[in-house]
């Protein structure tokens, strides 16, 4: 390999300064072409000419890496170019010229290289896209890995780096930039993989994957959403309804906002499922509907038991052949008439409440009705035996997720005067800036990045996790303790093996700080029934994480971790050593 400094290696020249932009903060930089690092590597019949530099962003302090690679044959003829950058993109494509025709010289130590310049210009340079994963959930390396595998399979890309996957919060000078970067995993078709926390306006799928240069914009029609994914840990062994039905409405609700996105149901079962066991009729029926709707199933073998419905009559026959619920329950039935199809199912919960609150049936009726439309039915769909009152529907003024689905699919409730104009929320998603989970998820991810591990997580608005024993066994925690009292659970339980510390963290907004202080007094049962029996003589700290406001110091002695609205982080001065270690060299105040 040959090494040079300057703007030319004798074959190619960067004839103009580089203009780049930090994708974390938007700061623009001009890079002097005279001070580039250059190297040449021979790969068989191809020569790779590397032009690169590193710099510190003037805006956020992040370390930026910029590189252009030019390929040539043995004669020095241009083949192609590409650009590989960390946390930075080109504002304008580099201007590359053939450097062999008009005499000129470049000093490389004591070695002088003769080269030339002509007017032949090699353009290139569409800035490389990034992958942006938007989610309401705590980003997990295993799920990111699965999603990237799915992306590569369906979008003709390939993984180029696959080491231990770690998720790093971007913290610069003590300020969290509200973005996470994936390390240890890279693909050929994207410069970087970033994660941002969002919330849905109503019925939101767990993950949205965009492929584009910059972060997606709320409400934009120009963004390139390529995948929408729902994740579930629930197996057919654990629940007859929840895994397949409860999430069904989400695949319908997204359609007015994004018509051409690929949809996925990801079974990420942490508990082992019994693959050889025949799934329940409910599981088969619901999964077949998802397949009919074009949803790709991942993490569950569909080759033996499942297939899409081929006709409306097949859908109706299958449902009619399923086992009926116990007496007193309203069965879900599908009945076809000449001018309508009636689908029965109770939406009220409790049965006499008159509301729309039965989540599994909301999902089931949404899925069934969407499937009926998919199979070609264009007449009325009427939901019967629903238990919903007119006064409840009038009170909602159409602002209800099932009424949104009714509007999307052209459904109506039997005996109910439906709202005249149901207006869907303007945004399908928005960046989260008002949830307590912003602080406790950041604390969770930062500590895991530095070697601590999660014993339990139940972040606000996220799927509830399992209790992890010291041997790695996963346990589903009950709703009650041994005395029949509600089992109070923290938002996250973190363990540091080196110091034998366990942190029980309750996440709250600044406005609900006092409630958090009171709630951590209720953790006796989880400590005595689960933590001490599994982890022995550990040191346990009960504490609160806070998001919101603009405090200049820790707002209460029980607050371990504070995240301000602008991203500024403050750590309690009495924080244990394991927390101090995790935030060392980030500029965070302690």
Short names for language-model regions:
Residues 1-17, 35-46, 65-120:
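Short, intrinsically disordered terminal segments enriched in charged and Pro/Gly residues
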Residues 265-382, 536-590:
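Domain-level recognition of nuclease-like catalytic cores that cleave nucleotide substrates
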Residues 22-25, 57-60:
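Short cysteine-rich clusters marking metal-coordination/redox-active sites
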Residues 234-279, 487-490, 495-503, 507-565:
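Catalytic cores of nucleic-acid endonucleases
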Residues 15-21, 49-53:
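Short metal-coordination and nucleic-acid-contact micro-motifs, chiefly zinc-binding Cys/His arrays
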Residues 119-184, 287-289, 318-464, 470:
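Interdomain/boundary linker segments immediately adjacent to catalytic/signaling cores
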Residues 28, 63:
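Cys/His-rich metal-chelating microdomains
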């Amino acid at each position: 390999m040959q090494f040079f400094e300057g703007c030319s290696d004798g074959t190619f020249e960067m004839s103009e300064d580089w203009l780049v932009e930090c994708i974390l903060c938007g700061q623009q930089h001009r890079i002097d072409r005279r001070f580039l690092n250059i190297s040449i590597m021979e790969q068989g019949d191809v020569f790779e000419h590397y032009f690169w530099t590193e710099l510190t962003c003037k805006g956020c302090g992040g370390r930026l890496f910029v590189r252009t690679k030019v390929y040539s044959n043995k004669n020095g003829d241009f083949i192609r170019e590409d650009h590989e950058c960390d946390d930075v993109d080109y504002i304008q494509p580099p201007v590359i010229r053939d450097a062999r025709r008009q005499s000129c010289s470049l000093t490389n130590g004591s070695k002088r290289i003769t080269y030339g310049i002509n007017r032949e210009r090699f353009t290139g340079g569409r800035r490389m896209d990034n992958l942006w994963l938007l989610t309401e959930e705590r980003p997990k390396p295993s799920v990111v890995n699965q999603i990237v595998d799915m992306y590569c399979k369906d979008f003709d890309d390939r993984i180029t780096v696959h080491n231990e996957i770690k998720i790093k919060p971007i913290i610069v000078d003590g300020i969290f930039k509200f973005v996470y970067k994936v390390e240890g995993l890279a693909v050929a078709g994207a410069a970087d993989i970033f994660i941002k926390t969002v919330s849905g306006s109503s019925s939101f799928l767990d993950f949205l994957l965009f492929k584009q240069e910059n972060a997606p914009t709320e409400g934009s029609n120009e963004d390139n959403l390529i995948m929408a994914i729902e994740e579930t840990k629930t197996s057919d062994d654990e629940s007859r309804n929840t895994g397949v039905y409860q999430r069904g409405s989400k695949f319908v609700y997204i359609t007015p906002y994004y018509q051409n996105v690929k949809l996925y149901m990801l079974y990420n079962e942490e508990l082992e499922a019994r693959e050889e066991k025949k799934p329940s009729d409910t599981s088969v029926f619901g999964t077949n509907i998802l397949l009919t709707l074009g949803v790709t199933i991942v993490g569950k073998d569909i080759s033996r038991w499942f297939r899409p419905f081929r006709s409306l009559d097949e859908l109706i026959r299958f449902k009619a052949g399923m086992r009926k619920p116990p007496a007193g329950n309203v069965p879900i039935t599908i009945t076809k008439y000449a001018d309508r199809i009636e689908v029965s199912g109770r939406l009220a919960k409790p049965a006499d409440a008159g509301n729309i609150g039965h989540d599994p049936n909301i999902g089931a009726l949404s899925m069934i009705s969407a499937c009926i439309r998919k199979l070609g039915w264009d007449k009325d769909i009427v939901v019967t035996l629903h238990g919903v009152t007119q006064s409840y529907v009038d009170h909602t003024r159409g602002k209800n997720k099932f009424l949104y689905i009714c509007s999307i699919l052209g459904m109506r409730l039997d005996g109910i005067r439906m709202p005249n104009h149901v207006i869907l929320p303007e945004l399908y998603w928005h960046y989260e800036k008002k949830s307590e989970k912003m602080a406790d998820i950041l604390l969770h991810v930062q500590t895991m990045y530095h070697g601590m591990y999660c014993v339990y997580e139940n972040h606000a608005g996220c799927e509830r996790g399992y209790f992890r024993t010291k041997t790695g066994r996963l346990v589903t925690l009950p709703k009650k303790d041994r005395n029949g009292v509600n089992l109070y659970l923290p938002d996250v339980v973190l363990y540091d093996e080196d110091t034998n510390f366990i942190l029980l963290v309750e996440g709250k907004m600044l406005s609900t700080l006092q409630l958090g202080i009171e709630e951590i007094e209720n953790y006796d049962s989880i400590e005595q029934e689960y933590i001490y029996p599994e982890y022995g003589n550990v040191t346990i700290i009960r504490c609160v994480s806070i998001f919101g406001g603009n405090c200049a110091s820790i707002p209460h002695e029980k607050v371990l971790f504070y995240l301000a609205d602008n991203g500024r982080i403050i750590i309690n001065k009495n924080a244990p050593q394991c927390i101090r270690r995790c935030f060392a060299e980030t500029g965070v105040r302690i």
